[in-house]
Amino acid sequence: MLYPTEFDVIVVGGGHAGTEAALASARMGAKTLLLTHNIETLGQMSCNPSIGGIGKGHLVKEVDALGGAMAAATDEGGIQFRILNSSKGPAVRATRAQADRVLYKQAIRRRLENQPNLWLFQQAVDDLMVEGDRVVGAVTQVGVRFRARAVVLTAGTFLDGKIHVGLNHYTGGRAGDPAAVSLSSRLKELNLPQGRLKTGTPPRIDGRTIDFSKLDEQPGDLDPIPVFSFLGRAEQHPQQLPCWVTHTNERTHDIIRSGLDRSPMYTGVIEGVGPRYCPSIEDKIHRFASKDSHQIFLEPEGLTTNEFYPNGISTSLPFDVQLALVHSMRGLEQAHILRPGYAIEYDYFDPRALKSSLETKAIGGLFFAGQINGTTGYEEAAAQGLLAGINAGRYAQEKDAWCPRRDQAYLGVLVDDLVTRGISEPYRMFTSRAEYRLSLREDNADMRLTEIGRELGVVDDVRWDAFNRKRDAVSRETERLRTTWVTPKTLPADEATALLGKPIDHEYSLAELLRRPGVSYDGVCGLRGGECGPSEPLAEDELLLAQIKEQIEIGIKYQGYIERQAGEIERNGANENTRLPDGIDYTEVRGLSFEVSQKLNQFRPETIGQASRISGMTPAAISLLMVHLKKRGLGRRKGADSVPGADVQADNTAAQQ
């Protein structure tokens, strides 16, 4: 039957990508339907019970800055919070949280059920409705047909998923859930380029059988307790729990080696490529044969369960080998395994067949987000889902697509890497992937993106008001520090010595003093008995005050580096954002080699910047393209039209600093 209501956007899948996509399009005012095979698993953490980390935490902050749910849900469900790289520079500091699976899932579902313009429906999707070269809806397992102007597909590991434990395997999207076999077959009929990837998960352990007296405790940060959302509060956190650390040993490694003849990875049963940066334990032992030990983190799954996640022993070895290797580790000698570890193979589709909006180039209105694009990780999925949801909503509203640039967001880096370079293994975000990471920090994600989010319609009044209070306070106080001066006469020598190590010998602005190594904002404001501080509090709320101080300190201390990077961005941006016409035939560009023109015609880059990052492209080829565009008057700057955020970065340069 044809469902009587027509939607603007249909989102298929209720994982981290699907939930962010559905919430984003609904926030924009698009009538949105979220189709999931099981409403009870909305927002489920299928693998590790953690959010964030190096590069990943940056994505979560960006999702939050654009009004997304992941950071806020983590604040409500997080049972341990830490700042990684806290002793290093601000560009690489990252938030990571352990989450209670149940509380996190509840927080996501609560947001879905209370979001205006969003409908939920429990049914697996078996088919897409395609008319000509555009998608017009989806068909469920029992034949219900839903029509929509745009469809976002976020199928995770469910597309023709196959689960492996030793040499045994069976069809499944994850343990306990069916695979999407019919939908996978339908997508293959559409001739979208695809391949196979694999990922894995470790056995889960009953905490009542762990000897914690033999393990090293790893507590979270307590002073201050981190929060993930820019609107979050430490008071929102439930009870906090420690993690625990053990190690593999030579006996563990011998057990693993003895089982490799029954490993699906090493017997050719698994054909999909696994994640380089989250390898299975058997892969670690093989690749790092000289190491006699690997660190294993025992992470609590939640407050109402005894289950522990042993981070570091993802495996598809037979269960008897899993049992032996677990028992070989200190503190786990008597451990009971609650669930076996397994590997899962699944279909993905070459992201080079996508536009930077995450819309497929072949089928109008069809968007892909998450692991279907070859990425790995909750955070990468959520960020893509948010972007796909925004652009699906804009597509339905007949507005131009939006995607942040590489110099605007880690989300921009992620998408650009996917659509220009493709993937040969599951893609994971790192800070090292971003050329402009000093400007793309966790702490300024809101300064970079919230104004754009407001223009897009995904940022509500509460977030917008809080952002403006923060931005205005940072701007006012930074200006005060730059224009308030002290002299050897007005700053007592003993105070200067206590703060700077010696008296000052000429006039300094407070900003110049703050720029000194080891000098803090509070230290500067405390000079002259506090007279160097602001006349009124910057904020009443302690968390907001801490955020404001952090922005001020980083902006002033790193001003020179940030300005240098801004200049580099401006110089490189001249050609980076020049658009390539949709219908250009690259065989007609004089001077291009056959190989280069063939690649350009195959991947259809949207900008000169994207073209330059395609494998095999040369500076000479880019020059020929620029000449071709100039002669024909074809090129225009990306963002020169009505796309939101085209001018936001220039307007917010001071705020970002």
Curated annotation (Swiss-Prot):
Homodimer. Heterotetramer of two MnmE and two MnmG subunits. NAD-binding protein involved in the addition of a carboxymethylaminomethyl (cmnm) group at the wobble position (U34) of certain tRNAs, forming tRNA-cmnm(5)s(2)U34. GO terms for molecular function: flavin adenine dinucleotide binding. Its cofactor is FAD. It holds the Pfam family SAM_GIDA_C. Coiled coil: none annotated. SMART domains: GIDA_assoc_3. It comes from Burkholderia pseudomallei (strain K96243). This is tRNA uridine 5-carboxymethylaminomethyl modification enzyme MnmG. It is found in: Cytoplasm.
